[in-house]
Amino acid sequence: MAASLQAAATFMTPTSRVQLKSSPSICKAFGIESTGSKVSCSLQADLKDFAQKCTDAAKIAGFALATSALVVSGASAEGSPKRLTYDEIQSKTYMEVKGTGTANQCPTIEGGVNGFAVKPGKYNAQKFCLEPTSFTVKAEGISKNSAPEFQKTKLMTRLTYTLDEIEGPLEVSSDGTIKFEEKDGIDYAAVTVQLPGGERVPFLFTIKELVATGKPESFGGNFLVPSYRGSSFLDPKGRGGSTGYDNAVALPAGGRGDEEELLKENIKNTAAGKGEITFSVTSSKPETGEVIGVFESIQPSDTDLGAKAPKDVKIQGVWYAQLW
């Protein structure tokens, strides 16, 4: 019993000083100057100082982590860049535009009037730009037996989906009717979106060979939708429309009954589809010939060269043009 009490008393007796071996890296990290091979310090004071330094280091690390997270999320927090006028875009240098998203935006106008304030006559539409702001795909819902409807999608393509520099003749009749024919320009863009269930839908956003007619508040027409893949594209088995193998599938073990499915895979179909678009003029600036508005387009998606049934893709956005 006495031995136990003596041991407990010895353990509880405070130690005034201890000898600690010094390490150059530890001394440098915690601001302790080493003298010789040993350093003498008060146990309670140094432990308190050590704990304080650890707390400060944790605060600094936490602040650095939060700062880095803020920097990473800064682009999405700021949102889309401010929409600029055509002259403002032209006045910027390449480095001022690079990485800002401005190159993927259609210009806007300032000081214009509501509606289509353009005199009747024949014009040449230039700098025609179409910028999508929404992609929806008609597909069955996630729930069982749900009817097909247009569903919101997630864009999987980078900011390269805007059509620009499109041009063609535009005629304004005396009764206010508009007729526009697309002739040239960057009139197609490959886009891929993802449905809520995870399925990805590629399509070729385009207005090739568009002939649009109607009143300024609603004019539109049909256009050509080329095949997403060309005839020289080879699938993983080396089959193509104009090159590659004609047949790369062995006879099915079950005999007949799969000919139609095999035919779709073997014989590539690069036929073009048809789409429909409707424009609406929201504002115009007669002194500069600038016109802006909104549009809605419905077109088919990619068919994997005829192997899949196309889906309807609805594209909504804004447009800009100059009339000369």
UniProtKB/Swiss-Prot annotation:
Similarity comment text for this entry: Belongs to the PsbO family.
Give the protein's function.
Answer: Stabilizes the manganese cluster which is the primary site of water splitting.
Swiss-Prot/TrEMBL keywords? Chloroplast, Manganese, Membrane, Photosynthesis, Photosystem II, Plastid, Thylakoid, Transit peptide
Gene3D superfamilies annotated for this entry?
photosynthetic oxygen evolving center domain, Photosystem II, cytochrome c-550 precursor
Primary site of residence: plastid
One Gene Ontology molecular-function label: oxygen evolving activity
Which organism encodes this protein?
Helianthus annuus (Common sunflower)
Q: Which SUPFAM superfamilies does the UniProt entry name for this protein?
A: OMPA-like (SSF56925)
Record's subcellular location? Plastid, Chloroplast thylakoid membrane
* Upregulating conditions: Down-regulated in response to mixed metal ion contamination (cadmium, copper, lead and zinc), but not in response to zinc ion contamination.
An individual GO BP term: photosystem II stabilization
Q: Would the keyword Nucleotidyltransferase turn up in this protein's UniProt record?
A: no
Pfam families in alphabetical order: MSP
Does the record's keyword annotation contain Plastid? yes
Transit pept. (range): 1-50, 51-77
GO cellular-component terms in the record? chloroplast thylakoid membrane; photosystem II oxygen evolving complex
Q: Which domain of life is it from?
A: Eukaryota
Q: What is this protein called?
A: Oxygen-evolving enhancer protein 1, chloroplastic
